[in-house]
Regions:
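Short clusters of hydrophobic/aromatic residues that line enzyme substrate/ligand-binding pockets
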Residues: 18-19, 102, 125, 159
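N-proximal helix/coil linker or "cap" segments that precede and/or mark the start of modular domains
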Residues: 1-8
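Glycine-rich, flexible loop/turn motifs
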Residues: 14-15, 22, 59, 64, ...
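Structural alpha/beta surface segment adjacent to cysteine/selenocysteine redox centers
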Residues: 27-118, 176-177
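C-terminal cap of thioredoxin/glutaredoxin-like
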Residues: 9, 31, 38-48, 109-177
Length: 177
């Protein structure tokens, strides 16, 4: 049985948050939730893969599960504001380590650590300036069959095995590329 299932995953877009290779042989797309402990757990092995393999790139798309992680949508919106200042991946790391603690004070603390302007941050979250961007990622994930986080796609195919299996799948796919 193929651990990678076909899906309707959107191609990598200009607005996506991307790290890793500028000339990738393999693309991982992760639908994630900053409040999800499994997304936090997956972040270190995925980072290790990015550090190990030059031909790998990672795309993050938001999929906050607010029923389980209240205010994870606001954390996603904060990361979008950080992205405007070239600090998305720094925000990504900090927000994952919050383990779902996303009170106003928690989010302000993260924004302060990112050296984001306090007034801009407060206005962006109050006005929900990035809500539509986050909702678009969620809708794209739903169309692609995402139901839980983290969900990974390897070159457009959904990984239907535990995310830990990426440690075997990525090297094999890169070797075949």
């Amino acid at each position: 049985m193929n651990p990678l299932a076909s899906s309707a995953i959107p191609a990598v877009r200009e607005r996506d948050h991307v790290t890793g290779s500028n000339n990738p042989k393999l693309t991982l797309i992760e639908y994630g939730d900053f409040g999800c402990r499994y997304c936090f757990a997956a972040s270190r092995p995925v980072k290790a893969l990015l550090d190990r393999f030059d031909g790998l790139r990672l795309v993050w798309r938001h999929f906050p599960v607010t029923e389980l992680h209240p205010r994870a949508d606001l954390a996603a919106e904060l990361s979008e504001l950080a992205g405007l200042h070239g600090k998305f991946w720094e925000a990504h790391s900090l927000l994952l380590t919050q383990h779902g603690r996303f009170s106003n004070d928690d989010l302000l603390s993260v924004a302060r650590r990112l050296e984001l302007d306090r007034a801009e941050n407060q206005a962006a979250l109050r006005e929900r300036r990035f809500r539509e961007r986050v909702l678009a990622d969620i809708e794209g994930g739903r169309r692609a069959g995402v139901h839980a986080t983290p969900t990974f796609f390897v070159d457009g195919e959904r990984l239907d095995r535990p995310w830990a299996d990426l440690a075997q799948i990525v090297p094999a796919r890169l070797a075949a590329a």
